[in-house]
Amino acid sequence: MRYNNLELFLNSIKAGKLCTGCCITFSDPAVTEIAAEAGFDFCWIDGEHGILDRTTAMMHILALKGTKCAPFYRVPSCDHTEIKKIIDLAPAGIIVPMVMNESDAEYAVKACRYPLSGNRGCGMRRGHCYGTMPMEEYMKNAEKEPLIILQIEHIEAVRNLDKILQIPGIDSIMIGPYDLSCSMGLAGQWAHSEVIAVLDEVCEKTRNAGILLGAYAETDLSRWIKKRQIQY
């Protein structure tokens, strides 16, 4: 954890802080370093919509070492080959978009953990401190990190949420309000009463499951977030 600030992020959550982050879509890692210096608790490095390759992803993650900001990386999908490319870079969290059902959730969780908890391939690189960390310590850490963050951003996923939340190993649910509104035929209208009702349902069920709750937010959404006990 000393290489990705995960413990610092989790301690802030436990202390009741609403952690804030910055979404990174540009290739220059200086942008990520600037975000950390600006005081953000985490950076969401976007491999789904951003123009980033694996080498660039590594540079963004390294840019946060020595800061107080945790690197989260959003992969393009729950495909284990996509997750494998990033997880060896030792980000604090893996964000998996468009999780639709319990099968997607289980697939993502297993891709992030070694056997017997999952099916991650054994690639000891940065998380193993390039061979300087005792193997026992590394494997113990690998059972807890990175955070496995699943995005609920489609009405189909909401309908399947009860089953999704029953999958062992999920660390956090992150709400995607804009994609959710699109899937409801209300594109961009996150404040519509029907969308708000669905967002509230996701919040309540996630909190009741004892799972960390995050959300994408712009200025207007931030007021809604504070009222729903969203943690980051």
Regions found by a protein language model. Give the residues of each.
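Expand to "…catalyze enediolate/carbanion chemistry for C-C bond making/breaking, isomerization
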Residues: 1-232
